[in-house]
Amino acid sequence: MMVKFVLVDSASLLSVSDVAFVSCPALNHADKKCGILAFLAPSSLSCCTGSMCCPRNSVDSRRSRWLRPFSLRTVVATSSSGWTSFSVAFSARCFAFCCRRNSSRKATFCVISRVAASESTGSGCGGSLGTRRPTPALGPILMGEPTVPKNVLVRDAGAFGSTRKELMGFLRRWNVNLRWLPRNFAFSLFMAKGCRR
């Protein structure tokens, strides 16, 4: 099954009607799959009680279930040109994984929403990112299990154009269903090296 996923930082995309939670093994990035990392305009998120966090109004207990905590690997683009990488492990309690299946294309669409910037970039929940921190609540995130290669390279969106039209065109070439993206698509687009066609 071809697994492609768009990772966004916006709760506006999520709703009870079209979001389901799936388990991490179904989304193994290291298993010859590629991912597109796209960031949308951030919106307010609220942290759930317990060890998991979720966007507002995104949980339907009849269809969804919380993921068990597991470690994440984040990739921070530290340069606007060329290839560079910086990885750090995050706790799953800082993020919510919301995914749904596009049966016609046999692809999985996934959303990762970051919690409040004070937690995601602080020294508590997310841990320190060293001397280089992403813009609060907008740092690029690479979803996957611990099997994701340690040195994942991320290229800046500038290589694909900076306008909405160019970025949306790039998503279309990757067969991303644009009906799943809100109209306020903006900010940055990242792609893991090795996922090009």
From Swiss-Prot:
Keyword list, A-Z? Glycoprotein, Secreted, Signal, Virulence
Give the CC-aspect GO terms. extracellular region
Main localisation, per the record?
secreted
Q: Which residues are glycosylated?
A: N102
Its function, per the record, reads: Secreted effector that dos not suppress the host cell death induced by cell death-inducing proteins.
* Family the entry assigns: Belongs to the RxLR effector family.
Q: Where is this motif: RxLR?
A: 65-68
Annotated signal peptide? 1-17
Which cysteine pairs are joined by S-S bonds? none
What species does this protein belong to?
Plasmopara viticola (Downy mildew of grapevine)
Q: Where in the cell is it found?
A: Secreted; Host chloroplast envelope
Q: Which gene encodes it?
A: RXLR86
Stated name of the protein: Secreted RxLR effector protein 86
Domain description from the entry? Has the canonical translocation RxLR motif, but lacks the canonical EER motif, which characterizes most oomycete effectors identified so far.
Tagged with keyword Repeat: no
